Amino acid sequence: MSSDQEMAVFGEAAPYLRKSEKERIEAQNKPFDAKTSVFVADPKESFVKATVQSREGGKVTAKTEAGATVTVKEDQVFPMNPPKFDKIEDMAMMTHLHEPAVLYNLKERYAAWMIYTYSGLFCVTVNPYKWLPVYNAEVVTAYRGKKRQEAPPHIFSISDNAYQFMLTDRENQSILITGESGAGKTVNTKRVIQYFATIAVTGEKKKEEPTSGKMQGTLEDQIISANPLLEAFGNAKTVRNDNSSRFGKFIRIHFGTTGKLASADIETYLLEKSRVTFQLKAERSYHIFYQIMSNKKPELIEMLLITTNPYDYAYVSQGEITVPSIDDQEELMATDSAIEILGFTSDERVSIYKLTGAVMHYGNLKFKQKQREEQAEPDGTEVADKAAYLQGLNSADLLKALCYPRVKVGNEFVTKGQTVEQVYNAVGALAKAVYDKMFLWMVARINQQLDTKQPRQYFIGVLDIAGFEIFDFNSLEQLCINFTNEKLQQFFNHHMFVLEQEEYKKEGIEWEFIDFGMDLAACIELIEKPMGIFSILEEECMFPKATDMSFKNKLYEQHLGKSNNFQKPKPAKGKAEAHFSLIHYAGTVDYNITGWLDKNKDPLNETVVGLYQKSSVKTLALLFSGPASGEAEGGPKKGGKKKGSSFQTVSALFRENLNKLMTNLRSTHPHFVRCIIPNETKTPGAMEHELVLHQLRCNGVLEGIRICRKGFPSRILYADFKQRYKVLNASAIPEGQFIDSKKASEKLLASIDVDHTQYKFGHTKVFFKAGLLGLLEEMRDEKLAQLITRTQARCRGFLARVEYQKMVERRESIFCIQYNVRAFMNVKHWPWMKLYFKIKPLLKSAETEKEMANMKEEFEKTKEELAKSEAKRKELEEKMVTLTQEKNDLQLQVQSEADALADAEERCDQLIKTKIQLEAKIKEVTERAEDEEEINAELTAKKRKLEDECSELKKDIDDLELTLAKVEKEKHATENKVKNLTEEMAGLDETIAKLTKEKKALQEAHQQTLDDLQAEEDKVNTLTKAKTKLEQQVDDLEGSLEQEKKLRMDLERAKRKLEGDLKLAQESTMDIENDKQQLDEKLKKKEFEMSNLQSKIEDEQALAMQLQKKIKELQARIEELEEEIEAERASRAKAEKQRSDLSRELEEISERLEEAGGATSAQIEMNKKREAEFQKMRRDLEEATLQHEATAAALRKKHADSVAELGEQIDNLQRVKQKLEKEKSEMKMEIDDLASNMETVSKAKGNLEKMCRALEDQLSELKTKEDEQQRLINDLTTQRARLQTESGEFSRQLDEKDALVSQLSRGKQAFTQQIEELKRQLEEEIKAKSALAHALQSARHDCDLLREQYEEEQEGKAELQRAMSKANSEVAQWRTKYETDAIQRTEELEEAKKKLAQRLQDAEEHVEAVNAKCASLEKTKQRLQNEVEDLMIDVERTNAACAALDKKQRNFDKILSEWKQKYEETHAELEASQKESRSLSTELFKIKNAYEESLDQLETLKRENKNLQQEISDLTEQIAEGGKRIHELEKVKKQVEQEKSEIQAALEEAEASLEHEEGKILRIQLELNQVKSEIDRKIAEKDEEIDQLKRNHIRIVESMQSTLDAEIRSRNDAIRLKKKMEGDLNEMEIQLNHANRMAAEALKNYRSTQAILKDTQIHLDDALRGQEDLKEQLAMVERRANLLQAEIEELRATLEQTERSRKIAEQELLDASERVQLLHTQNTSLINTKKKLETDITQIQGEMEDIIQEARNAEEKAKKAITDAAMMAEELKKEQDTSAHLERMKKNLEQTVKDLQHRLDEAEQLALKGGKKQIQKLEARVRELEGEVESEQKRNVEAVKGLRKHERRVKELTYQTEEDRKNILRLQDLVDKLQAKVKSYKRQAEEAEEQSNVNLSKFRKLQHELEEAEERADIAESQVNKLRVKSREVHTKIISEE
């Protein structure tokens, strides 16, 4: 809790945010008795404070604060929290959490004007109904960057937390501000926007300049200004709220990568258009109308031709016209200012006001009815003139279009008459359409202005939707608003209560699921499900003659009495009529459906729309420019009136927008703000208890607090936790060794002094209870403060010691000066001193003259030398400048590449983190989808029961509609038509004839009088529509019946396919995610282990080739063993088939015996023999299966172990190969790449096969050469190590000498400068002279020629041959020039060295400095030598690739041999130079000539290396420029090779898994072989890989689907035949069970295969991406090879480590495959266990048959018991085998499950109680059977054992004694096992049922929508066609008669 000083930053807002220290102290010292202080229930106040006086018999007597004594029940008493919890900021921290505690905490805070309170994870705000100073800039600044626990509750705190989460978690955020109407949502939305607009641009004002001339404000100003404009046109006064938002908006504020404001956009939902023309008494229209009439801007009054009195305009004066809390004049200025700031042009601004004024004038248009006619005509034109002027129209055209609209009939337009009522309705519709389209257009313009085109990274969305509304008159708008709030509340409940708890279970935290009872699915589905309210409304809109009453009747028929949330309202006095009531989460709302059909269809006068499109007001013309623009402006509902296919209702558009909104919200991290209405009277400070409690219950506030307290709301990934909180106790995590993040987090938390029950460890995250994370943050801040303080102290101490040392030195200097001054003062008057002063200058001058003479001579000499050296220096300086420039350019290039590499690595790390986050999101989304499916599952059962009923009712409804239409239009009794279609057609023919006669009569009347023309045409049109509708309905219903059936069958098949695919995809996704997490963890562990094993690499080199051969041998052996296993499996499958045949035959025999009723002893004997044979075969088969599986598992394990061991050894050898055999590995890689590439190209170019063979031959030759080079490299490496050691020693000695030289140089500064100049000149002479420049120019010239030749070789292969030959000749010429130049340079350098030797004799003290230069140059020489080696290898590889691709193998051989020879010569020279350098280095301090020889050798090598380096860099550059295509082919080739290896590994795993399962499912074996063949082809033909896999999978799915369809059909047939014959049912159930078992195993097999393939593909993609990254790094390393050899080594080490990691990952993949195989083995064992149980059941049957045979008196009863037991066992097997398909067969299997449970209960009771509580029908029979069975078993147990000879059954069923363990114990064990299996299968069935229900609901919803769309399209199309035909006939007849 902050102190008053800390709260001072909030300024005047501090008292409204947090209690003062004085109040907190008083609360802590307040007397309190926890036992007697309570809340008690009160009928008036809900709860009151009281003091307990006594407790007796469950009753409590208490005295309230008011002094009243009450007696209540114990459960109506709630303990009170201690006073320190009064006005607590987070109600989750309260000791006692219940409704009265929450209510009074809110009430007390509200009384103190603390309107914001935390409630667990969200914030509760109470509307104060007054202005509070808590939103000023001072408060914004105070909340910026504060953690939630550091500042009082506030909307700014929620906003800042969302902002910080967005920056840290890199995830989009959303703030959902919900509550009932009038709760303060709009105000809080504006505050959120104000906060973001303030903090996101602080300090960046200069950057937010307008991007165009139209913008009048900065981006933050525009975002803030959007609210006043939208409120003016979209907000209005309602009964509960003076500034109610009559539209919903979702404001997205986009931020850049740095968190700065980038742009914004607004999405609006469902503007309440009806308010434009109608308001209730206590309400008023939109604010803009009253702002304009406030006369604040008189020019608007004049421009719009209006008055300042709202009562002059009917549309805006139906309710109130003023609002006390709103100043319309000030609001008008704010609106006008917002229009300017938002960049609207002056024309657009004027158009907005004009269209608004025109809407007001529309309400004053008057029309009257013509005399003796129903035709309407204008009653005056003054108002119409004003409206037309404002809209840029002609008033006469406008009135004519309103009164006489033109309707298109066929291809012609017909003028139609309108009644007065129709005209008024059309005017109102036009006014609403203009206002609505203008509003949407303004929103689009605002979005256009707010889109700054700046880069966006993330956004924060703020949702402000109209709150829940309960008015006296609730229409369609209220239903849409309340439905939206219902969906948002469901989203809140799901996020807070379901996802939160599922996250705990997913992470493995012990948690019991808590059902808070907050599921709102019933009400939501009642509104939006098929045949829901919206669906019925849209269906009614499709029928021309549908009315509000028909809509109400359909609602009642569908839902009244069937849905608890749909009720018939009770009539109330003084209230508007209500037609139905809905029970929402916030209360029951009565809805009036008057006019809903028209509102939903939203018709417009097309003639007036045509005028609008031609308006001179551009904005109006733009609004109605056509359907395309309508959709663009967000209003597609007006655009499609010409074709039925484009017809879209308001409700459909609303649902579409709502679904988009919910999708957006689910993709963000939500933050909830719950707004509360304190009272209905808008009184500040007053709180109505019951009203607040109702909102708290509905909003889930208490449940949210409860789950926050019980659960773990805070969580963080292990890696993030370790990184952030390691500072708390760094010693807990050991340094220098790898430790898993989870273990590190556990150790860290264990070492911290916190309550260990307050956190839990999940699989990927650590979870904290509420408040603990804040405590850790405080501890971290304290620790950081301590560390910083300690660091500052040490820094200050260091600075103080330095200052003290300076002071000591100054003091000593002062003492020295003082001593000398005192001494001088003592001797200055001494006579000898005076003489000394006089003589000393004379002596010094004589010496000076001598010295000057000598110095002049020396100066002359030096001057001459200087002149010579100066000339040389200038020449060398010029060269130095050029070289320095080149060096700087290279350094800049290297630096840029290094920065790019760093950026790439950073991006890679970010992508990895993002990938982890996205995977977590995918899991959450998947779980969320599963939750949604579970929510919908309950209703699916009801829907399934009603499906048949609905289809029948729908047919009846269609027939009734046809009948009603005929009764209304034809006035004939058509009851016979419903019974028979033939009679209906006859009636229609008669009706058509009569209508034709009436039409002729009407046409004759039309010729007689023009006055009756319009009325008669209306009748003709009406009758024609009726006739065509009837004809169309009859024809279409007859024709579409068969199409509908076919369509439903097709959709049913598609549904089944989609359900199977969905389930497989979900399962595979979960498996892949789990496997990925395990593999990632193991990958980290393996990387750490590999780092420790690298030291053993050098000892394992000789074993590489032998191990590879061994691997191949083992693989060949494994393939042989796998073939043997396949043969064994085939035999096993045959045996299994024989077993199933015998089993089926045995069952048939048993059934025949049962049907016969009295089997003979011979038949029983035969049955026993067959069963014994069957049992023996089964036992043999099981033993063989176990043996084969054990053998296969052992072989696989042995193979995996050997492969792992060999792979580990290979990995160990890899580093040595790459480090010590650079040339060998690169050339081998190049040749392998060429060979692989030629294999690929050989399919298209057969002529390259010869080159492949040539390359293979050359490979063997190169390997021998490489072996020799390997030995040479080893020797050179050893020499280099010794030289490096000696160089280090020399460097140390040189450092010491440098220090000595620096001291001597102070005394001889002039001479040292000359020496330094000479040394620099000497170094420059050694580096380069005129010969070097000549050689460089010739080399560049040669390189230019080579570049031109290389470009020409792209034009043709012949030109490439000539270019390569010429380049080789020029290279040879250059080499000869180089050799001659080198000889000349050597002679010149020898002369220079002699001169240097003489100088060195005179200046021997400077030898050490020169020696330092020698050592550094030696290092440079070695570095450049390595670079030369690498670059030479690169050139050789590139030349080899070019030669291979262009069929120039011979030239390649020549070039390769030349480079090889040169390479060997260079190595020989290097070896000689190194030996000579080593010998010279040892004698450096004794022999002076050693320096000359070393320098000579050094310069020779430098010259050669530099020339070679220049040549190679130029060649590399031109080859890189000209060979882009070659490199691309190489990359493709390497990718293919990598994919080949990866896919090969995956293929082996997949084959192992498939072969393991092939023995069980023979029908799937062919499909898996097809998968294998497809994968093999994919390796050879990469381009067809994906298509082949898809086709293969599709074939598998189709085959499996067809199999499943066949089994389902057979299953359904079996169920239908069950009613006819029980014997046939048993046989078909056995077949069905067998088929289902095979299909289920096939599905499991396919899922496992698909999961392995997907996992393999993921690893393949990861490896490819990693390889691409490494290739890019390698390319950069090659470019930086000249100056950054150390970086090359580092990157190569990185490459090696990555390669090892990839191989480790492959090994882990193999391990995972092995685990999968082990799991399959376990599965097999479980299947064997199941078979054993089935065997036991069969044995029980045989035993009971034996008992029946021996018990003659009870033979018939025992036989019946055996029949019952067999039926029970068969149904148990049926339930077990068909559980995977229950989602499609639940309805048919419900009875079967019940029978199974019933019989299982009977068996359990029989075993436990001896038949005491049997069902009435079987009681007597089973009792007798039980007694006989027990008596017979006691006498014959030994005989039964001998006959059956089943030792395994004897051991399992514990038949070891004769009397103690009899039939009861055996049956008990069997029943327990069966019951456990039944329960497990029930759980599986429920899960499958839920999935099935979800899929069925989705399918049926789609099916229903499709049916509706097709029906609407067919109806509209047939109506249009027939109307066209009829109109043509009428037109032709009229013309002919005229």
Swiss-Prot record:
Residues that bind ATP: 179-186
Keyword terms: Actin-binding, ATP-binding, Calmodulin-binding, Coiled coil, Cytoplasm, Hearing, Methylation, Motor protein, Muscle protein, Myosin, Nucleotide-binding, Phosphoprotein, Thick filament
Subcellular location, record wording: Cytoplasm, Myofibril
Residues recorded as bearing Phosphothreonine in the entry: 64, 69, 419, 1240, 1264, 1285, 1466, 1500, 1516, 1729, 1735
Ranges where the Myosin motor domain occurs: 86-781
Coiled coil, from the record: 842-1938
Residue positions, PTM Phosphotyrosine: 389, 424, 1463, 1491
Residues in IQ domain copies: 784-813
GO annotation, cellular component aspect: cytoplasm; myofibril; myosin filament; myosin II complex
Pfam families documented for this protein: Myosin_head, Myosin_N, Myosin_tail_1
GO annotation, biological process: muscle contraction
Region Actin-binding, annotated ranges: 658-680, 760-774
Region (Disordered): 1124-1146, 1152-1171
Residues in Myosin N-terminal SH3-like domain copies: 33-82
Assembly: Muscle myosin is a hexameric protein that consists of 2 heavy chain subunits (MHC), 2 alkali light chain subunits (MLC) and 2 regulatory light chain subunits (MLC-2). Interacts with SLC26A5.
Residues annotated with N6,N6,N6-trimethyllysine modification: 130
Function comment: Required for normal hearing. It plays a role in cochlear amplification of auditory stimuli, likely through the positive regulation of prestin (SLC26A5) activity and outer hair cell (OHC) electromotility.
SMART domains registered for this protein in UniProt: IQ, MYSc
Domain notes: The rodlike tail sequence is highly repetitive, showing cycles of a 28-residue repeat pattern composed of 4 heptapeptides, characteristic for alpha-helical coiled coils.
Modified residue annotations for Pros-methylhistidine: 756
Annotated family: Belongs to the TRAFAC class myosin-kinesin ATPase superfamily. Myosin family.
Name this protein carries in UniProt: Myosin-1
Source organism per UniProt: Bos taurus
Modified residues (Phosphoserine): 625, 1091, 1095, 1161, 1236, 1242, 1260, 1287, 1291, 1302, 1305, 1473, 1494, 1513, 1541, 1553, 1573, 1599, 1602, 1713, 1725
